Amino acid sequence: HHEIVQPVMDMIERSDGVVFSVSCFQGHLTGVMKNFTDHMAFMLHRPRYFHKKALIVCTTGGISASSTTKALAATLPGWGFNKCYQLPVTALSWNAYEPAGKDLRKAEKAARRFYLDVKSGRMHPPSIGVLIPFNLFQALCVGNAGEKEYPTEDNHFWPRYLGMQYAPG
């Protein structure tokens, strides 16, 4: 597990921003992307990408591009991502799609906003729905630093970051 996931985590860490290109399957993330988010689920307990921004792109030949981008955009702040931009595009043809002017303008607007935000280094305030679990995990685990009977990686992680803020700066 670690050998597969760590290189991806390292790439995210070295990046200024991350573009996720996701497919839609039955109105949601595909099994492959769901497997990836499952492998990264420990990040909800030990987030770290506080200065990272994400652009989530989904095209679908029908419906549900929005629900697909929203699903990933709901997960990434728990990993620490500071801001998630979404670009859902619905194609009118599965085989011969040519982007409409509206879709091109939408893509340019999303890309420009993402780029300017990454370039600015601006930190956006986190939502209360992100702050509550962040502070809860920190408070619960710091007191368990010396836990011998049921040691967890969380109990080793959080004492090193005692007092860490979700969105420093």
Q: What are these model-derived regions, one by one?
A:
Residues 82-169:
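Glycine-rich phosphate/pyrophosphate-binding loop and the adjoining helix
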